[in-house]
A protein has these predicted regions:
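Loop-to-helix junctions at membrane interfaces in multi-pass transport proteins
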Residues: 58-189
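Cytoplasmic-side transmembrane-helix entry/capping segments in multi-pass membrane proteins
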Residues: 54-60, 237-240, 267
């Protein structure tokens, strides 16, 4: 249940990204992102998920670096952007935020949750069981740490600097697509906007694999009636049908998003 709520945050982010880039309304974006996810996740399988995760990870790294450099250049350098932020509100660059809401306990718990707690999330734990050997596991720790640092540090820094470069942005969930379209030519914007879409798809891949497995194998196939009636060639059809129904459910949940996506993820 909670994972379905978390997945709805990915739908919201994907729909807002498509709305900003393609000029469509939010609800149309929800439908489009649902169709994309059906083809990427439902009919892909585990091997396809792992391959796409790797490709999308590379897209995220290069796009983060390109956008960070472009925002700094567009804003006239770090010093100029910093001065703009201070002119808006001197408290923006303090550890406690513009209105003092970022208390030490909130920030520390946030980073423990995001930085350490994710290791225990089921969809992450499943991927950790798929390493070929110990050598692959050790290599992934090093590579993963570098990748996470680049993406997490880069995207958060872009978000802060965007306030100094484009202070009129009100929809904070749409910051990345808005500034991308403003600071980059269309061909680079297309590449960079593939990064948040890649992040959305990789997250949904892992979460959906877990939900599908838990719902179908642990719940539905544990009942005697379904176990007896769904056999042979009926099993793949049944699995695909349940997966599509889950996606449709999440699609309807996402039609009325919260004010900020992070609230759903933290919940």
């Amino acid at each position: 249940v909670f994972l379905i709520a978390t997945m709805s945050a990915q739908w919201v982010g994907g729909a807002k990204l498509l709305a900003a880039f393609m000029g469509i309304n939010y609800k149309t974006g929800i439908v489009v992102i649902s169709i994309i996810i059906i083809f990427c996740v439902v009919f892909g399988g585990l091997k396809n998920i792992l391959i796409t995760d790797m490709i999308q990870g590379l897209i995220m790294i290069f796009s983060t670096i390109i956008l960070l450099y472009s925002v700094i250049s567009y804003g006239g350098g770090i010093e100029n952007i910093t001065n703009n932020l201070l002119s808006i509100n001197e408290k923006i660059l303090t550890p406690f935020g513009a209105n003092g809401s970022l208390t030490p306990s909130y920030v520390s718990s946030f980073w423990v949750l995001v930085g350490v707690g994710v290791i225990g999330i089921p969809q992450i734990a499943i991927n950790s069981m798929l390493y070929k050997n110990k050598r692959s596991l050790k290599q992934s720790i090093i590579i993963g740490s570098i990748v996470i640092f680049i993406v997490m540090f880069g995207v958060h820094l872009i978000g802060v600097m965007a306030r100094g470069v484009f202070p009129d942005i009100k929809d904070y969930d749409s910051v990345i697509p808005i500034i991308t379209l403003k600071v980059l030519p269309w061909y680079l914007a297309a590449l960079v906007l593939a990064a948040p879409m890649a992040a959305i798809i990789t997250t949904v891949n892992a979460q959906f694999l877990l939900i599908s497995s838990a719902l179908i194998k642990d719940v539905l196939f544990s009942t005697k009636v379904i176990k007896e009636k769904i056999v042979g060639r009926k099993i793949p059809i049944f699995v695909y049908s349940i997966n599509i129904l889950v996606i449709i459910l999440i699609m309807f949940i996402s039609m009325r998003p919260p004010s900020l996506i992070v609230n759903v993820n933290l919940f």
